[in-house]
A protein has these predicted regions:
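Redox cofactor-anchoring modules in respiratory/redox and cofactor-processing assemblies
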Residues: 1-116, 125
Length: 126
């Protein structure tokens, strides 16, 4: 087993952080059991959809249900713990997920697809 502690601040996007960890666990899955092999891929697809600005509130609900399914039906510790970053961020930072899908904004300003720039013509000199 292993464990770790990561310190983050308001400049960390919790949705992107969950996506990062799911990317790792998807790559590390041995592929023996379907819940882990396919489930982590589906979770990652949903997270990528949300961080790209194409997610829906239904995707958030689907994430949570799929996390519980993977956790309860995977054969090994990797599959059983793979959903933890998603479940933790949904529990404590659900508002960030909602901001991504409803407001189409990343509160931390991390998700590039959700960044919008505007030129203020009267302040622009050039």
């Amino acid at each position: 087993g292993s464990g770790g502690l990561i310190v983050m601040d308001e400049d960390t996007c919790m949705v992107d952080m969950a996506r990062y960890f799911l990317n790792f666990t998807r790559d590390e899955s041995c592929g023996k059991c379907t819940p882990c092999r396919v489930g982590t891929k589906r979770l990652l697809e949903k997270l990528e959809k949300i961080t790209s600005g194409n997610g829906t509130l239904e995707d958030i609900d689907d994430l949570e249900a799929l996390c519980h399914y993977i956790k309860e039906n995977s054969l090994c510790g990797l599959g059983q713990t793979a959903p933890n970053p998603v479940l933790s961020t949904l529990k404590f930072f659900r508002d960030e997920y909602v901001a991504h899908v409803v407001d189409k904004k990343c509160p931390a300003g991390v998700c590039k697809s959700l960044l919008h720039y505007e030129i203020v013509a009267d302040k622009c000199k050039g």
